[in-house]
Curated annotation (Swiss-Prot):
One of its GO terms (biological process) is pollen development. Signal peptide: none annotated. InterPro entries: Seed_Dev/Stress_Resp_Reg, TGA_domain. It comes from the Eukaryota. Disruption phenotype: Absence of entire pollen aperture, leading to male sterility. Required for pollen aperture formation, male fertility and LECRKS7/DAF1 function. Seems to be involved in operculum protrusion. Participates in the modification of plasma membrane at future aperture sites, possibly by creating close contact between the plasma membrane and callose wall to prevent primexine formation and sporopollenin deposition. This is Protein INAPERTURATE POLLEN 1 homolog.
Length: 232
């Protein structure tokens, strides 16, 4: 199954070659919404839970295309971090208001991915693999968060003394963003590999639905209504 070409990477490159992250992300969501998610759903409906999961069958090909699409998203965030590190570690203007509570260092918290997999009632073997990934996340997230905090504190102290090095500060922010995206990429790859076949496809379908739901107009309308009438 041929994969659709990825949208051009974000950044400040030559006109026509690159575009703002807002435009990239809109195109990325559009491709996930169609054709990738419908192709995956059709492959799931025509397969069974006993699918062998060979990477040449339609189900595995559709799942691999969705996984590659998420990996391309994090690669795009890496490219954005090299162009504008401050934006890469914050909530970009392309994010929906519903996404904001779930963000960590510029994108979804990796623990959301393992929580999503747990909600699918995985087998004991897959649950054990998820536990291992969770332990890795619990070790890495505080380390990256502490590093970001130390970078911020060092810049504040240097600014007060009149010796702030903006270039070094941005370089550190870039490295933090790259490490966070590396963790996200590894978490998804490890979980997909552990699940395999039909379970991996179910997991990627659920992840796609979750991401798209945060940009669904009806969901956002209800979210805005709740914000407009707190406590009702």
């Amino acid at each position: 199954m041929p994969r659709p070409p990825p949208p051009p990477p974000p950044g400040r490159g030559a006109p026509g070659a690159r575009r703002p992250m807002r435009e990239f992300f809109a195109a990325w969501l559009s491709t996930l919404r169609s054709p990738l998610l419908p192709l995956l759903r059709r492959a799931l409906s025509s397969s069974s839970s006993s699918s062998s999961g060979g990477w040449d069958d339609p189900l595995s090909s559709a799942a691999a295309a969705v996984e590659a699409h998420f990996q391309a998203h994090w690669s795009a965030l890496d490219a954005a971090a090299r162009q504008d590190p401050a934006q890469a570690v914050s909530a970009g203007d392309w994010r929906s208001p519903l996404e904001l509570p779930f963000l960590w260092v510029g994108d979804l918290h990796p623990s959301l991915v393992t929580s999503l997999l747990r909600s699918l009632s995985p087998s004991p073997r897959l649950l054990a693999a998820t536990d291992r990934v969770d332990r890795r996340i619990r070790a890495a997230v505080p380390s990256i968060s502490d590093r970001l905090r130390r970078v911020q504190e060092a810049f504040i102290s240097a600014e007060v003394s009149g010796a702030a090095d903006v270039e070094a500060f941005l370089e550190e922010l870039k490295d933090v963003a790259l490490d966070a995206n590396r963790l996200r990429r590894g978490v998804l790859s490890e979980l997909v590999a552990a699940a395999g076949g039909y379970q991996a496809a179910l997991f990627l379908e659920a992840l796609s639905r979750f991401v798209l739901s945060m940009h669904d107009p009806e969901v956002l309308r209800r979210f805005d209504q709740c914000r407009a009438s707190p406590g009702s």
